[in-house]
Structure formats: C-alpha cells, structure tokens
Amino acid sequence: MEMRADLLIVGAGMVGSALALALQDSGLEVLLLDGSPMSVKPFDGAAPFEPRVSALSAASQRILERLGVWDGIANRRSSPYTDMHVWDGSGTGQIHFSAASVHADVLGHIVENRVVQDALLDRLHDCDLGMLANARLEQMRRSGDDWLLTLADGRTLRAPLVIAADGANSAVRRLTGIATREWDYMHHAIVTSVRSSKPHQMTAWQRFTDNGPLAFLPLERDGQQDWCSIVWSTTPSEAERLMALDDEAFCRELERAFEGRLGTVLSADPRLCVPLRQRHAKRYVAEGLALIGDAAHTIHPLAGQGVNLGFLDAAVLAEVLLQAAERGERLADVKVLSRYERRRMPHNLALMAAMEGFERLFQADPLPVRWLRNAGLKLVEKMPEAKALFVREALGLTGDLPALAKA
C-alpha cells in the first residue's frame, strides 16, 4: 500500500522532530518517519548521565520553548552554565567569558541528547502529527512531480517535498546524489561523564593540549555540581591508549591533562570514542528536497554548536515554508526552498570556518605560533567589547534569526 503526504521528514532525531513541531499548525499533511521505535523511556533522575550531550544556546532554548518542549527538558535534567574558561596548555594565555558581560542569566545549558530527544517525542505524541516508526529508507527516486520512497519492509511513500533530517550519514542525501565536501580531522573524541572533588562552578572549562582540546562541561544532579561531561579530542593512537586504561588510570590521566583545575577526578562512567569528521553538503536544496541539521553539515565538537545550527535550520525552513504557503506558492519549488539555503548556508559555513581555524591554530606547534596564540588570548582577555561579541555569538542571538528564536 502506498502512503501519501504533503511533506515527508526523514529522521526523527532532535532536528527533524523540531521541524515537525514547527509545522504542526501549517495545515500540511506532515509525516515524520524514522528507523527507530520512536518510543520514550521513563526518566530516572538517579541514572548515570548519557555520554552524548549538547550545549544548547539561548536561541535553541527559545525555539524549544515556543515548540512547547523546554519544560519537558527542564523537568528531566539540564545544567545551566554562566561562564566559560579557556586556556592554552602550552603557555600562559587564557580567556574568560561570562553571561553577565552581556546582561544574560546564562550562556547556555548542557543537556543530554536523550533528554532533548525524549522531550521532543513526548510533545510529538501529544500533537496530531503523522509518525511512522521502524521505517528504514531503502530507495528514493523521482516519480512525476513527487518523490517515491521505498522502505526496507516494502512499503512505499509518496510526497512532493522531502526533508532530510537523517543525520551525518544521511540516506536521503546519498540516494539523491547530493555531494559533500568532507575531511577527516585525524582526531578521535573520547566522551564520558566524570565526578570531581571540586565543584564546576557552573563553568564550561576548556584546555587546549598538544594533542587537541579537552573540555569539561558542567552537569548538575539534585543541585550537586561535582559532575562534568568531558569531550577529549586527541590523536587516534592516543585515544586508543586512553580507551585501553582501566577507570582508575584513566581518571589519573584526565586529571593530569586538565591540570587538576577541578581537583581529583573521583570516577568516570563508561567511555565512548568517536572519530571526528567534518562534512558540508555542496547544496542544501533541490526540487522538492531540503537538507537540515547533520544531513547538511557536521562540525568539530569544539564549541558544541552542532545541534544549535540544526535547530536554526529547522526554524528557518519552517518559516520559509509557512510564508510560502500563505502566498499560495508551491512549497516544493526549488526557488522557494532556496530562500532557506540562502539564509542558512552562509551562517553555517562561517561558523565551520571559524571552528576549523581555531582548531588548527591551537594544534600548530612552532614556537612563533604558540607565542602569537598566547599573546592573542591575553589581548582579547583585556578587550571586553570583543569578548561580549564572542558571547553574543555563542548565545546564538546574532545574524538572520527566525521568528522562533527571537526575543
């Protein structure tokens, strides 16, 4: 049997789910499909932290509030942070960013991805939106003015407009032949949660080591500030060595690499190790097709901005589609969809380039580069206006914001 919709969203992760919610009152027949069961786990506040977290910006918080999702996150578990401290492990340069410098309450919230996902799914289940679970895409081709999708179980779906929100290894992007520019950082990231003897002080800490950045991101449980999510970017060989250590030895290595800023590392949860690659689609749209989130771009986890870019993608695309619908335009028209690409691609590319340059700068080892790097950090630390600009960018409140992200 063939199913039909006005718009198919492939991928019910955080970004795809947000887009579906943003379109819930559009009058369009929206169908959200995913290869997972799309079920919500009962939340256990005493359970260990999930290893994968996101640093949600103020813009993302506004979007999630307006979609009716933020309370579901706050009622589970989220950790606000007010400050960020960055320093160069090869010198004396350091810089401190504060929410107070721009009269904000917080810089953002560290939230487990599973918490965000479950809050979104809870909201989706409360809405009158079509959802198709355990739906794995196998084939996709043009059929007249529509896309015809075939699932692994043989079912077929038809729609004039398909949104790819199916992640970094997007099947939609592959099946429709959209090329990407991608490169391997030759680094792996070790992620886990650790408990320290000193409180994190609602501060995100980041040290640049000779092998890559090491971040301690604050987590909070029952008002206690002694847990952090860590993201340790290093060479593949060093990552392999660190992953082979027992928990006690790993904690001691982590403590040394972090210069004991948070005292003794008391314990560590199970570790994950993931290779770091950056991808960017050469185009975000085609006739009847748009890419959002990691399907369009993946960036270095250095700034924790990946999902924030994705939420802005979803909010802008929803805005473009709703405005086009009001004008009576054909939503699948590539000219309509290109409005989304024009608004999002330059911003995403600029942030990706900045993160790439920052990462390369701190990996450069020659003495003159290290001297300039430290001098630059010290200089910016003495320039409150420059630091405030960085903070506003981190809050996600600059550039061409969609209505969902505006105050």
Predicted stretch roles:
Residues 238-332:
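FAD/FMN-dependent oxidoreductases across multiple families
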Residues 5-32:
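N-terminal Rossmann-like FAD-binding beta1-loop-alpha1 element of flavoenzymes
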Residues 15, 38, 169:
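Conserved Rossmann-like nucleotide-cofactor binding loop
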Residues 48-89:
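N-terminal FAD cofactor-binding segment of flavoenzymes
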Residues 2-3, 73-175, 183-188:
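Conserved N-terminal helical subregion
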Residues 64, 146-148, 162-264, 268-271:
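Conserved FAD-binding catalytic core of PHBH/FMO-like flavoproteins
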Residues 24-50:
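Glycine-rich FAD pyrophosphate-binding loop
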Residues 319-407:
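C-terminal helical "tail/cap" subdomain of flavin- and related membrane-associated enzymes
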